[in-house]
Regions:
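Hydrophobic helix-cap positions at the C-terminus of alpha-helices
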Residues: 17, 35, 71-72
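Enriched for short, Lys/Arg-rich terminal
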Residues: 3, 22-25, 60-94
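A short, surface-exposed loop/turn module that caps and links secondary-structure elements
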Residues: 34-58
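A generic structural signal for short beta-strands and their flanking turns/coil linkers
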Residues: 31, 45, 55, 63-65, ...
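Arg/Lys-rich, positively charged N-terminal/basic patches that mediate binding to nucleic acids
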Residues: 1-31
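Histidine kinase transmitter module recognition
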Residues: 16-20, 38, 59
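A broad detector of the eukaryotic-type serine/threonine protein kinase catalytic domain
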Residues: 11, 15, 54, 89-92
Length: 94
């Protein structure tokens, strides 16, 4: 299982998103658990980003909610860390 690292920008966007849509909080936390267990689980629709966001990845929470993240080497060894960068609608994060 990979370790999730919540970047400050992700933490802020998560709070804003769940304040606007409280029902999303549990769904997002479930997706984060799945992401830590298997980032390429088909239900997440994980994909590489291109252009200005090259080097980052995104996964699907629901129709108009995406999580943007990066794989970083774990200084302690083992599986890569997943650094959570942003969460929001398609137009907000891309």
């Amino acid at each position: 299982m990979r370790r999730l690292v919540w970047d400050a920008s992700f933490r802020r966007a998560f709070k804003q998103r769940t304040r606007r849509q409280p029902s999303l909080q549990e769904l997002i936390l479930d997706v984060l658990k799945t992401l830590a267990e298997n980032p390429f689980e088909p239900s997440l629709k994980t994909h590489k980003l291109h252009g200005q966001l090259e080097g980052l990845w995104a996964c699907w929470v629901e129709y108009d909610c995406r999580i943007v993240f990066a794989f970083e080497p774990d200084p302690a060894g083992g599986d890569d860390l997943i650094v959570l960068a942003d969460i929001g609608s398609h137009s907000e994060v891309y």
